[in-house]
Regions:
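Soluble FAD-dependent oxygen oxidases
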Residues: 1-361
Length: 361
């Protein structure tokens, strides 16, 4: 849980309660000089601020964290999918993408209701598949959840897209989460992933939302996998925390990832070319339509240019100052962590990796 909380941390309750970092009340830490300290709102306050969102492997070894406890609540979850070529070939590519574009229109209203939607666009043999797994409605009844989905479902029906949603109400959070969310795999060695926190301004005009949609569509049509969330961990939802979580989190309706893969066992040259195309091609398109926004460092591209702005935003200068004060000898290091620009990892094959020699820049 350390890296999850220290890096910000999003969850199925983020549109209600904010980020994981927003829940922290105190932390016990071993500092780089070997002291065991408590950091909270009254002592070691700079360290406490930095730990809540400024990234792991940077400021100390966190041995324990005290967090807020929220009351259990009921939840309704819905899962469904539709695929180009489905319904005996009746779902056309044009209608599929119209459906996805329509879906984006609902992000502001859904997030205002505390919704956290976990959705995918996955390449298949017949064309892309849209998968919702799940549409997560904490505190909502079955009827309320169906009402939230009804406008978009009506549009899907009008587009001749048939689907069979499985919508289930649970009296408690944990059984709902256990039944609704997929088993996650660790990152694979033949996959590169990057993310973008698309800003709320992108929903302020049809032109900007269309540009966002086209950037996502372009990646999907190149057979990249899209993994995304409706999410709104705003300052209001997080209880107006004063912490170091990326400010881009406070101004988004959508955390969207894309991933590219190459053949297992591919040469270093092939892998490097794929990564370059991904970082400076597909990811650059996303940056171009969300200038000044950011990326979630916990689900990010290791080659992200200007990672200081993307992962930490306007908080980077303060974080770097705290890093230099607490860890002047750079006892702690992680790639793309605060202060890591003073170092580089030199690998034998030139691939970006933490497996190599750590050298001063």
């Amino acid at each position: 849980m350390g890296g999850y909380i220290l890096g910000g941390g999003h969850s199925p309750l983020s549109s209600l309660y904010g980020l994981a970092a927003d829940q922290v009340l105190s932390a016990e830490v071993v500092t780089p000089d070997g002291r065991f300290v408590t950091a909270d709102f009254t002592q070691n306050t700079d360290l406490f601020w930095a730990l809540r969102g400024g990234g792991g492997s940077t400021f100390g070894v966190v041995t324990s964290i005290t967090v807020k406890a929220h009351p259990d609540l009921p939840v309704t979850a819905s899962t469904f999918s539709f695929t180009v070529g489905g319904n005996n070939g009746s779902i056309t590519s044009e209608n599929f993408w119209t459906a996805v574009r329509n879906y984006l229109d609902y992000f502001p209203s859904l997030s205002s209701q505390g919704i956290y939607a976990y959705w995918f666009i996955i390449p298949t043999a017949t064309g892309p598949m849209f998968l919702m797994q799940p549409f997560w409605a904490p505190g909502k009844t079955l009827e309320e959840t169906n009402a939230l989905l009804a406008p978009w479902f009506a549009q899907l029906t009008a587009l001749n897209i048939t689907f069979t949603p499985k919508t289930v109400h649970y009296d408690s959070f944990y059984p709902g989460w256990l039944a609704s969310f997929p088993l996650e795999a660790v990152e694979k060695t033949h996959v590169a992933t990057g993310s973008r926190l698309f800003p709320k301004e992108n929903w302020e005009s049809p032109e900007s939302l269309n540009a966002t949609f086209e950037a996502i569509k372009t990646s999907s049509q190149a057979n990249l996998t899209i993994i995304a969330f409706i999410i709104d961990p705003s300052l209001k939802n997080g209880g107006y925390p004063d912490n170091s979580a990326n400010p881009a989190w406070r101004n988004t309706y959508a955390h969207v990832l894309q991933s590219i893969n190459w053949a297992q066992g591919a040469s270093a040259a092939v892998q490097l070319q794929a990564r370059q195309n991904f970082t400076f091609g597909f990811m650059q398109r996303w940056r171009d339509v969300s200038q000044g926004a950011g990326s979630y460092l916990g689900e990010s591209d290791i080659l992200e240019p200007d990672f200081q702005q993307s992962f930490y935003g306007t908080f980077y200068d303060r974080l770097l100052k705290i890093k230099k004060q607490l860890d002047p000898k750079d006892v702690f290091f992680a790639q793309t962590a605060v202060g890591s620009e003073s170092w580089k990892v030199v690998t034998a094959n030139g691939l970006p990796s933490g497996d190599g020699r750590l050298c001063r820049v």
